[in-house]
């Protein structure tokens, strides 16, 4: 970002990576300082697939959050808190629809203490199976 004058940046703003490794902290600060748009992807990713695990989304190389509305909303709010102006949904219609259905809440309501606690708990469980 110091070499070119970008208007936007596409970056994986994943809550488990952020909580466990501080992933995304530097880019989040930089885009805020420079007034650059931030497109957040991988917000709805839980962890890597486990070997032999059933994969209902065969084109996905990582396990999406599905069936846990509270975690999905908290994960989206985390990405917005990090500075995402736009969230890029996963590639299937169900997840795309989930993001559309919950976008307003993510941009108008802050993460609650309960949501933070849930994200930290889930991040601890995913610690050894992070996507990067």
Model-derived segments and spans:
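Beta/alpha (TIM)-barrel catalytic core signal, keyed to glycine-rich beta->alpha loops juxtaposed to Asp/Glu
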Residues: 1-132
């Amino acid at each position: 970002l110091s070499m070119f004058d970008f208007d936007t940046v596409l970056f994986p703003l994943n809550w488990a990576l952020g909580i466990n490794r501080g992933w995304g902290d530097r880019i989040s600060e930089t885009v805020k300082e420079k007034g650059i748009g931030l497109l957040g992807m991988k917000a709805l990713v839980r962890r890597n697939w486990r070997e032999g695990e059933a994969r209902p989304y065969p084109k996905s190389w990582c396990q999406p959050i599905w069936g846990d509305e509270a975690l999905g909303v908290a994960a989206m709010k985390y990405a917005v808190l990090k500075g995402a102006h736009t969230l890029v949904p996963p590639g299937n219609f169900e997840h795309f629809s989930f993001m559309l259905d919950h976008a307003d809440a993510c941009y108008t309501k802050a993460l609650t203490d309960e949501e933070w606690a849930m994200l930290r708990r889930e991040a601890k469980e995913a610690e050894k199976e992070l996507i990067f």
